[in-house]
Amino acid sequence: PRQGKAPGKDCIGNRPIHEEIDMKELGRIITLPKIFDPRGNLTVAEGETHIPFAIARTYWTYDVPGGESRGGHAHKECQEFIIAASGSFSVTLDNGEQKKTYHLNHPWEGLFVDVNIWRTLDDFSSGSLCLVLASHKFEEEDYIREYDEYLKFVSSKNSQNLSKTENQ
């Protein structure tokens, strides 16, 4: 798996962000700084400080009807950080071999999703707001929107990585 060093001084999970992290883990919850104040609390997420990439795009989903799901795709190059800014929802991550579901319901926590990971968001509570910080601007060619195509893509990537390892 690809290893990466995330620059900065804060935390990814419970580890300092500058330590090596396995960028192919099936998601990682990152706890962001919380500033408690009687006038209202504040949480901040800075790219390359609190999350392991520079932020190129921000988008959010809201008013998701009951029973509907979002996502249903993977990215070839774009990393994402998903936050339940309000309410709650579930995110199921799938690398073609295993799946893991996270329930997001705290605005001071987010889910880091690396490249080549299929994601599906569902179980949205009423009034929920899903905030996503992305490492790349929107490019349709970065998306894999069909699951069968995704499985072929990750199988090909895994074969390429195995060949590189054997040739070293």
Feature roles, as predicted:
Residues 106-110, 116-118, 122:
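Well-ordered alpha/beta subsegment
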Residues 1-22:
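Short, Lys/Arg-enriched N-terminal segments with co-localized hydrophobic residues
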